[in-house]
Every structure is written in structure tokens, then in C-alpha cells.
């Protein structure tokens, strides 16, 4: 009987602690703007493409951030951002060395993450993890191509918008995680203002290429994003 009473008292104390902590949280909602730079590389099989080399390129990342604090150390965060995910392909087969293509892909990204925070009242660290959905809005390419005669190889520059076709998977999804740092530079009774720095890694789990009729050719984009933000909590 005494053990049951002790268990009951422990549960009551735990519940009271959570309620008391929540009651002391003045600002549950956080809204903000963010912007920065990212680097994207493509994960693709080299089967049948031994003369192709892929390398990452940079792109812009800017958008909105919304967060709801469940406790002092846990929040649910959702971002809505426009992101350019770019990479480069080079041909390295002797006389084709000058040939290359830059791929620039504009995406709308919607990550949903758990935000685990730690630290003091003003300076706090954040560990983020979750998933995201994305929509491929536009695709652009530029580079140098070639054409041949019996005796010569000619090179031409090209640049333009690429039209989507049935092989493109425009809706994609994946896992996202990273670290963040925030500093509250203004604290008022009804509002806090803070600046933030986030490093997030987006890992595609859905190929943006559906493949051909008799050939599977999955292509996944992986992006490291660094952004600065301005946040308002209320």
C-alpha cells in the first residue's frame, strides 16, 4: 500500500512540475524570417556514365519560420522556404573535357521538425530533426555541349529553362536534421526578439527522376543549408 502511495505522490509531483514549468512560459509562439546559402550534391549511380563527374554548387535559401513551444526544452517547428538546389556535371573523356552542365532547380520546401533546445534564457542551442515535403517549381540548365564532324569537334554554349516531362518527379520528400543557435537581444513582457543561426541537412528519400521504361535511374538531391534569421516570440 505504501508503495502505491509513493508512486501516486511521484506522479502528482511530476505533473505539477510540468504544469508549473508551462505556466512560467510567457511566449509559446515564435515567428520569423530566414535567409542564407546552401550547397547541393546529387546521389546518382555511375552505371553507364563512367565519363561523368558530379560536384556540388551553391544556391539561395530564404523563407518563413513558425514554432510552437510545448515545454521549455521542446517545440514543434515548421518552415516554408524557397530553395535553389544546384549541382554540376563535367564530362572527362579526353576530347570532351570542355563539356559541362550546371543544373539549377528551384524548390518550395516544407520541413516539419522537433526542436530540442538547451541553454540559458538569452543564448540557447537547438537540435532539430524531422521530415520534409518539397515541390520542384522550375529547372534551368547552362553549360557547354558539343557536335562532331568527320574531322573536328565543335563546342557550343547553351543556357535556358528546361521543360518538365513524364520522367520528372516534381513532388519529393525526405529527412532533415541539424543544429541551431539563437540569441534573444530584446526581452519585453509580451514579446521577445532574437537572432538565429541554423545549419540543416536535407536528405532526399524520393528520387526526382522516375526512370525510363526499361532502366531505373534514381537521382537524389542532398542539401546543406546555412541560414540567419530574425525571430519574434509572443
Language model region names:
Residues 41-57, 84-107, 134-172, 204-225:
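Extracellular/periplasm-exposed beta-strand and loop segments of Gram-negative cell-envelope proteins
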Residues 168-173, 182, 187, 192-198, ...:
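Outer membrane beta-barrel transmembrane domains
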Residues 33-37, 60-68, 80-82, 110-116, ...:
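Residues on the lipid-exposed face of transmembrane beta-strands in outer-membrane beta-barrel proteins
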Residues 1-29, 34, 228-234:
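Bacterial Sec-dependent N-terminal signal peptides
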Residues 23-65:
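Short glycine/proline- and aromatic-enriched beta-strand/turn motifs that initiate or cap beta-hairpins
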Residues 29, 60, 74, 108, ...:
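Hydrophobic core residues within well-ordered beta-strands of beta-rich domains
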Residues 23-28, 73, 119-124, 185-193:
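Short loop/turn motifs that connect adjacent beta-strands in outer-membrane beta-barrel proteins
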